[in-house]
Amino acid sequence: MIVLPNKVRIFINDRMKKDIYLGISNFGFENDIDEILGIAHLLEHLLISFDSTNFLANASTSRSYMSFWCKSINSATESDAIRTLVSWFFSNGKLKDNFSLSSIRFHIKELENEYYFRNEVFHCMDILTFLSGGDLYNGGRIDMIDNLNIVRDMLVNRMQRISGSNIVIFVKRLGPGTLDFFKQTFGSLPSCPEIIPSSIPVSTNGKIVMTPAPFYTVMVRINPTLDNILGILYLYETYHLIDYETIGNQLYLTVSFIDETEYESFLRGEAILQISQCQSINMNYSDDYMMNIYLNFPWLSHDLYDYITRINDDSKSILISLTNEIYTSIINRDIIVIYPNFSKAMCNTRDTQQHQIVVLDATNDGLIKKPYRSIPLMKRLTSNEIFIRYGDASLMDMITLSLSKQDISLKRNAEGIRVKHSFSADDIQAIMESDSFLKYSRSKPAAMYQYIFLSFFASGNSIDDILTNRDSTLEFSKRTKSKILFGRNTRYDITAKSSFVCGIVRGKSLDKTSLVEMMWDLKKKGLIYSMEFTNLLSKNTFYLFTFTIYTDEVYDYLNNNKLFSAKCLVVSTKGDVENFSSLKKDVVIRF
């Protein structure tokens, strides 16, 4: 670890795929509490800008921090990627503090699309921020557009809070001149912020929150000490369904259960977690997980790998101490419980955006202060990989699981999805068959639309057949190479329970690079949040899908795009009753 005079921390991470990865601690949307919710997220969208033909890049805003990364592709170099990312924050050697009203307006529209996307596909319920005075969704809404000048002032104010002690940089290689470049830019920031925000309200403990969730989860407040962090790292590397959350200076260990009986036993204090010592902890974490640790605990003064001997040699005492602290918090009701609830009628609390939620007190009724049993945990295995065809009945459940677990990755092709995970076959089956997970998987049908229409365009099945079997979609043979004949009609209007545009497009020079560039152009116009595309077996032919509240504008953009020599697009209007009758008439897809 290299520490600049103003406390910027720089790490060389030659294993990561990114060229540069930068994080800013104490800079997430928890800072929006008592201000305009969404300022942090809007700032992230305003800062990131790049040439998608030369770079891959992304940014994210979480409760506690913001992060950005950039990777060079094609003719660009690692140095180009580093300079591109730095340019998001500095202009002519000075920290950016000026944002045009037109750009702010476009990105607010994009935020509304992101809100729509996330609430169609996920249940975006941030319980900790809600209990601390924020909302269940804190990413920004369209009504920010009514206060553009105030929003712009807040953005400038937020930039002035960035300080060297907040900055963490991962760089793949520290090339000639790179360190000096960092010193001239991020190294020029004050070691403490020019503007110090008010303290973040403390979340209310001793609560049971009933909300849509795939698992029964108990968030146990523990002290944010080095030993407890090492204990969390030990548990995370060894077991599934264990993680941590932070808000302000508070630290929670999160433990999820698929069995309600085990959850109740843990909550009543009659059972403790069955934690066994493994052979060794390797700290072989992803760069995302490592970055999150440094950002959530900015007081860490060493490289995490400096603690690898301690976490292995002292694991027994670390885990005993952590287990005792967990049990003490359970008994003292220093917890927040998430109980899966899918009833739309049941409601006693609303946030300002009208999301329904039930909040109850976690009482001491039935507490047993001497545990007499232990609960086994799901152990991580070495990485497994499976391939699921679009016709497999487990497709949607696996997609739902990947959306709820960050350590499961999906890759799509014309025939199905490739899934990488570290669960045992028995554990996967237990999750898939659990009552709460099944209800959660079915509670957000919007995710299925992407695969319903992919199956329609990539197979010989009629829309009626697919809708009749929508819980599995229908299998098609990989040996059948489709020949798609585009008819005269380029637009088919339907009614579904979500608003989206999808379809197939073909073009002589059409490739993934041009589609990525197209997606970013649509994002800059505020018309979409993201666009998924899948390369079909037919030459130069892709399937596109995007959730959007601006369906007509997106259709016009795609319909008038010169890269497409042929197209067949479906435009969905949101409604209570589905109507796909237009797809039964003259859509021409031959095999």
Curated annotation (Swiss-Prot):
Lineage: Viruses, Varidnaviria, Bamfordvirae, Nucleocytoviricota, Pokkesviricetes
Function: Probably involved in maturation of some viral proteins by processing them preferentially at Ala-Gly-|-Ser/Thr/Lys motifs. Does not seem to be responsible for the cleavage of major core proteins.
Primary localisation category: virion
Source organism (scientific name): Monkeypox virus
GO biological process: proteolysis; viral life cycle
Localisation: Virion
Gene Ontology annotations for the cellular component aspect, listed alphabetically: virion component
Enzyme Commission identifier(s): 3.4.24.-
Enzyme active site: E44
Single GO MF descriptor: metalloendopeptidase activity
Broad EC category: hydrolase
Name listed for the protein in its UniProt record: Metalloendopeptidase OPG085
Keywords, sorted A to Z: Hydrolase, Late protein, Metal-binding, Metalloprotease, Protease, Virion, Zinc
Residues binding Zn(2+): H41, H45, E112
Similarity section: Belongs to the peptidase M44 family.
Post-translational modification (record): Undergoes proteolytic processing during the course of infection. May be cleaved into 46 kDa and 22 kDa products (Potential).
Cofactor note: Binds 1 zinc ion.
Pfam families: Peptidase_M44 (PF03410)
Cofactor(s) named in the record: Zn(2+)
